[in-house]
A protein has these predicted regions:
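Sec-dependent bacterial lipoprotein signal peptides
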Residues: 1-20
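Structural signature of multi-pass, alpha-helical inner-membrane proteins
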Residues: 2-4, 22-159
């Protein structure tokens, strides 16, 4: 894998939330810090970490640290955007505390994986290539987010 800029890593940290498995109307639920979390992750078993399956049909598994490094409370706002490939995405702005948490977490985990968990499912687990702080981009797979997925994410984050 080639080296990415901090912006690309943020995109890749992609909070790649394909919400196809979420029920319609999920955006109507109250904002809950447990809905979206970022965790340290590993392809290998780690004592006291839990194994989780990826949301998609791949059936892949990853080990995640039980305690989240960041959650919805660390996100200040979100707006529709485009990723570096022009796909539908969501631009996140972290709170001051969230930006500091992300900077510290990503700095300490360069070269390691971070799992993006939404409603108890692993959405993505990119490798952190450099420190990330105040902004990140949510994108998804090869085609980006659908309009419905983007709306749901915006509704949840901006509550």
């Amino acid at each position: 894998m080639s080296k990415f800029s901090p912006r690309q890593v943020a995109v890749w940290l992609a909070l790649s939330l394909s919400l196809a498995s979420c029920v319609k109307g999920k955006a109507e639920t109250p904002r809950n810090a447990a809905d979206l979390t970022i965790h340290a992750a590993s392809d290998e078993a780690v004592p006291e970490w839990k194994v989780m399956k990826f949301w998609d049909a791949s059936g892949g598994e990853i080990w995640i640290e039980p305690t989240a490094a960041l959650n919805l409370d660390d996100i200040q706002s979100a707006e529709e955007s485009r990723d570096e490939r022009g796909r539908t995405a969501i631009a996140l702005r972290f709170t001051a505390a969230g930006a500091e948490k992300m900077r510290m977490f990503s700095s300490a985990h360069i070269g390691k994986k971070a799992a993006i968990v939404f409603d108890g499912k692993v959405m993505n687990a990119p490798t952190i290539m450099s420190a990330i702080s105040s902004h990140a981009i949510i994108s998804s797979g090869q085609s980006g987010l659908s309009a419905d997925q983007a709306e749901r994410i915006l509704a949840i984050v901006n509550r």
